[in-house]
Amino acid sequence: MTVRTIEAKTLLAGHKTPDSWFGIKYTLNLYRGCQHHCIYCDSRSECYGIADFDGEVLVKANAVELLDRELRSKRVKGYVSTGAMNDPYMPVERRLGLTRRVLGVLAARRFPVHVMTKSDLVLRDLDMLGEIEAACGGVTPGAVVSITITCADDALARQLEPAAPPPSARFAAIATLAARGICAGVLLMPVLPFIEDDPENIRQIVTRAYAAGARHVIPSWGVSLRDRQREHFYAELDRRFPGVRARYEQRFGNAYSAQSPNAPALESLFTELAARFGLARTVAPYRAPGPEQLALL
């Protein structure tokens, strides 16, 4: 996979109100394209304008300087998200350390972060996450890490997310993050109909997340199906899961999204498990520490 650098004109995208699922106020993407090659990834869609999502990674070489400059004008603190259209801890990050340097800027500027990833490489940056938590935590966490886990079985995950670390490593990463006082949880999405949408898979993910110390599990009972994303996904289904594509075409046609036929049962099971384990299903928007808490920092 080719890796080359580009100069970005802007980095941060702001939202008038924080996202209701993830609590995010600002988003940024340090890379374009991704090395994990998940067969279902929505970022292949034409609307994102990434010409060669699976063949080339573009690195925003000036991201650190841009972020530092753009944060100076942001008067409202809120979670800055990494990982919306790619994984901030894809393999190239091990060598480049761009995500790590961005975390350093967030710590220095006292901005909270919500990291979304499939990789246990996030553990490399425990020290930076700890700095952000110390600088920003209080009413709500200063540093949140959500790790995507859509199936509990390592062998199945290799078919769906060929270059990402296995679920077992991701559960272990959650345990390490939680032990170090970082708010960690699971993104249980997408759940692929006819492949991952059985109750036992959901039960295992939620139970293992709780055992690892997760504070939240955010579910979605289906997958989007847009233009190039659908084409790639269906080709991979033909190669890896013969016969499943026909079930998608019969059930969903050209629909934008494919919700699992089992969604009501999965939702009922999830609600029961989340209540039993005390797991949130969203991340609340960031609330800055009050004056009395700031005095203790």
Language-model regions, residue ranges each:
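Conserved strand-turn element in the central/C-terminal portion of the radical SAM core barrel
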Residues: 152-156, 161-163, 176-198, 221-224
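Short, hydrophobic/aromatic alpha-helical segments in well-folded domains
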Residues: 101-102, 125, 173, 187-191, ...
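Auxiliary Fe-S-binding modules of radical SAM enzymes
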Residues: 1-13, 176, 194-297
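Short, glycine/charged-enriched secondary-structure capping and boundary segments
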Residues: 95-97, 128-131, 160-162, 200-202, ...
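Conserved Radical SAM active-site core
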Residues: 1-146, 150-158, 167, 171
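Short beta-strand segments at enzyme active-site cores
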Residues: 80-81, 116, 184-188, 217-221
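A structural motif
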Residues: 110-111, 182, 214
